[in-house]
Amino acid sequence: MRAHATSTITVDPRGPLYDDLAQALALGAVVRVDEHQPWNSLDVADVSTYSARVFLAEHGINSADDWTAALGEALNPSGNDIDSVLGFRADLMRTGETPTTGRWRAEMHEWLHDTDQTDDAHDAVDRIITAVDDIETMFTSAGLLEPGIKIRSVAGHRLSWAVSVARWGSSSGYGDYQAVRQALLAVRDLAGRHFVDWNEYAASTIAGFALEADDHTAAITTYLPPVATLLVAADSPWRNLTFPTDLDFAL
């Protein structure tokens, strides 16, 4: 993993470093490190209010209400074809046995047949399973996954995006400090329900980037350096903050 840790982590000295808000911001650190921006800033660096609103408009967000709705969607880290296919395997794994790719594929197709799904659904399942198998092989080779460990969801990718939506809301003025703070803490709480540590979160996040991309190999090439750096660098928030489980910062 250290061989891939070639990125640089930057910090905003005015931003949170060790509290629950810092934990929330650290969940969006992959994109920030990739873009050479401070991981702990509430705003997007070097972006005017106008530029932030132009960016959000490109994602269909043109008002405070739109921003709130986009946050709600981002905070629902499940529901598409990728989640369904990974969730199907996760259910098979509840017996304590990890199914082979062949069994996963066969039982998924059997379920699709039994529920009268379309040929397109069968094709989508084949594409996703093949991509997941490739991605897990690359992750194991890079040291991101231990041999035999599988990706259970891409919720990390959605939560990372939710942090970005919160930040853009701050930069655009669509969200005031309290609204942005509450959004970030909601991301933090969800992360604690889905993952047990930064490593599991990291694998889910980069897998989501890869599976959403047209070229999953190129996406991994892009995001593996910031992920590896966050996992191993001494100055990383992922090394200096515990993962946000429920009781880290009791009120």
Summary of predicted features, one role per range:
Residues M1-Y177, Q182-L251:
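Polar/charged low-complexity regulatory segments
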